[in-house]
């Protein structure tokens, strides 16, 4: 799952985000990467491995998480996309 969002304050967002690791674990969401945009560090992207699209959607739509997103300075709704892995390359060779 990819999530992209605009935030007002990275340090505040990261602090609140880090508090929610157990909630994400319980929803079957394992963080793989956090990115910031080179042109604007207030745009972030996250990559997660997920156990279930349904569980991830339920987590993201929960009132508690929606409120935490606001508290974490996320502007508007994050853009969420679900993808199926079709190929993986490690060191330029298939894994």
Where are these regions (language model features)?
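Residue-level signal for secondary-structure boundary sites
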Residues: 11-13, 54-56, 88
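A short local structural element in Rossmann-fold oxidoreductases
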Residues: 14, 57-60, 70
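Short amphipathic alpha-helical segments
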Residues: 9-32, 64-67
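A generic short-segment signal for beta-strand/edge and adjacent turn/coil regions
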Residues: 1-3, 12-19, 47-52, 93-94
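Short, well-ordered beta-strand segments in beta-rich or mixed alpha/beta enzyme
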Residues: 1-6, 33-62
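Glycine-rich beta-strand-turn "strand-cap" elements at beta-sheet edges
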Residues: 27-43, 68-95
């Amino acid at each position: 799952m990819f999530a992209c969002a605009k935030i007002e304050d990275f340090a505040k967002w990261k602090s609140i985000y880090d508090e929610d690791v157990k909630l994400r674990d319980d929803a079957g969401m394992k963080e793989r990467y956090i990115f910031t945009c080179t042109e604007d560090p207030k745009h972030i992207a996250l990559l997660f491995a997920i156990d279930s699209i349904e569980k991830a959607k339920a987590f993201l739509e929960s009132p508690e998480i929606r409120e935490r997103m606001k508290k974490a300075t996320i502007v508007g709704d994050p853009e969420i996309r679900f993808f199926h892995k079709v190929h993986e390359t490690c060191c330029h060779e298939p894994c």
